[in-house]
Amino acid sequence: MIRLLIASILFFIPLGGFADEKQREIENEAINLVIKKYGKGLENRLKGTELNPNYRSWYENDCFVSIAAGTFQEGTWSAMEWYSVNVCSSSAEIMD
């Protein structure tokens, strides 16, 4: 009975869920690069507002990720800065 339960659970797990893990790791690495290079500046801009920087990512390919840094308040997310991140060369630059 337990084997049947485990088999049915494994059957319904989408195979795409495993493929997205690599993409999530790349996006997390890109966000960490932005935080490492620009995090203190963003925190200083928000000092006294009781807000913290929040990050969103857009995966382009295994090397390039776009990152938006902003704030989330009362159901609204507002972007402060956009970054172009090259994970392969560990570089992050502000987008113009």
Predicted segments with their positions:
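Short, non-transmembrane alpha-helical segments in secretory-pathway proteins
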Residues: 19-54
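C-terminal partner/receptor-binding element of secreted or periplasmic proteins
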Residues: 28, 91-96
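Short, surface-exposed linear patches
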Residues: 19, 48, 87-93
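Sec-dependent signal peptide recognition
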Residues: 1-7
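Exposed beta-strand-loop-beta-strand "reactive/processing" segments of non-cytosolic proteins
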Residues: 46-87
